[in-house]
Design a protein with these regions (language model features):
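Flexible, polar/acidic helix-loop-strand segments at domain edges
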Residues: 91, 171-260
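Second-shell loop/turn segments in exported
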Residues: 88-89, 129-137, 152-157, 228-237, ...
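Extracytoplasmic
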Residues: 74-77, 93-98, 107-110, 115, ...
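Conserved small/polar residues in nucleotide/adenosyl-binding loops
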Residues: 302-308
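Extracytoplasmic/secreted envelope proteins and their assembly/folding machinery
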Residues: 97, 128, 140-148, 163-167, ...
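N-terminal targeting leaders characterized by basic, low-complexity, disordered sequences
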Residues: 1-20
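Entry/capping segment at the start of metal-dependent catalytic domains
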Residues: 23, 27-108
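Amphipathic, coiled-coil-like alpha-helical scaffolding segments used for oligomerization/assembly
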Residues: 137-201, 255, 275-281
């Protein structure tokens, strides 16, 4: 067939239209990427503002001796969780619970290591004493220094909560479901007698009527009472109960953030003290969706190997 001038013009026109279509597609894809980037920037900015507002509710306490230390070392973030036993009846404010939270990006695991409060250790600048005495002598700074000196575990960040914060945290995520023995249920009721008096709550508040045990739903005060029981299984059983409750709370935390953010902020933050900076809290918030998918490993303290390959 003989191609006419009209056919040639038509073919050239089709090529131009095809090229123009590809340019439009590329241009459209670029606009899409720019839009996605802008959305991410706005979300990040919004998250930063939110973290700033939440951070303002916390109690920040800088520790100069570790301020320049990085939060993360060798892919592992170590944060010391301290439960402070400081109540209105004049107790000395020793650390009632100490759990080392080690987040390993390499193994994709969260290691929870309970440090027994009655361990006899060397306390820098003081006579040998129980580990929990270090906090009453010199606060979180001396406690971290004591742990590092005795166990060769470097810790530069901590989070301190009081009893009220712990109970509020459990309530904010909707409570926890755990298997309790009848004896453990009885102890919960016994501790609630003291708790209700301290907080001015009516006698009998949150008591269990059924003392047979089994799968039990615990609210905040009940979970706190369960964790403080050191008469069943001594301090080993006590720290195991603490890890059980904390594990359940971590599992329920993502849903709690979505369904009850105000409860978490109002109930926890004013009762929390930390040396984590706002920038570090922001980085942790960005990592949170990934971290909360990690397996949680309760570490044995009879032969302890941390993600840093150090042993205790």
């Amino acid at each position: 067939e003989i191609e006419t001038k009209t056919d040639k013009k038509s073919r050239k026109g089709n090529k131009k239209e095809a090229g123009s279509g590809r340019k439009k597609k590329k241009s459209g894809f670029k606009r899409f990427l720019i839009a996605v980037a802008l959305i991410l920037v706005f979300l990040a900015a919004g998250l930063y503002v939110l973290v700033g507002k939440v951070y303002a509710e916390m109690n920040y306490e800088e520790i100069e001796s570790v301020a320049s230390s990085p939060m993360k070392e060798e892919g592992v973030t170590n944060i010391l969780l301290i439960g402070n036993d400081s109540r209105e009846n004049g107790e000395d404010g020793r650390s009632d619970a100490m759990i080392l939270l080690s987040i390993s990006n390499k193994t994709k695991k969260i290691y929870m290591t309970s440090l027994l409060r009655d361990m006899y250790v060397e306390i820098p600048g003081h006579k040998d004493n129980r580990l929990n005495a270090a906090y009453s002598y010199g606060g979180a700074e001396l406690l971290m220094e004591t742990i590092e000196q005795n166990f060769d575990i470097h810790i530069s960040r901590y989070v301190l909560v009081n009893f009220e914060a712990f109970a509020n945290l459990v309530d904010a995520v909707g409570g926890v479901d755990l298997e309790l023995t009848g004896k453990e249920v009885e102890y919960v009721n016994g501790y609630l007698v003291e708790y209700n008096i301290l907080l001015g709550r009516p006698e009998g508040t949150d008591y269990f009527d059924d003392l047979s045990g089994g799968m039990v739903h615990l609210n905040g005060p009940q979970a706190l009472a369960y964790c403080r029981n050191r008469y069943i299984g001594t301090d080993f059983g006590r720290t195991e109960r603490q890890r059980k409750v904390l594990t359940e709370v971590i599992h329920k935390l993502p849903k709690g953030v979505l369904t009850n953010p105000k409860g978490l902020i109002d109930g926890l933050m004013p009762n929390l003290t930390t040396n984590l900076t706002q920038a570090e809290c922001y980085r942790l918030s960005l990592m949170a969706p990934k971290i909360l998918t990690y397996d949680i490993i309760p570490v044995s303290y009879t032969h302890l190997t941390l993600p840093t390959n150090r042993e205790v």
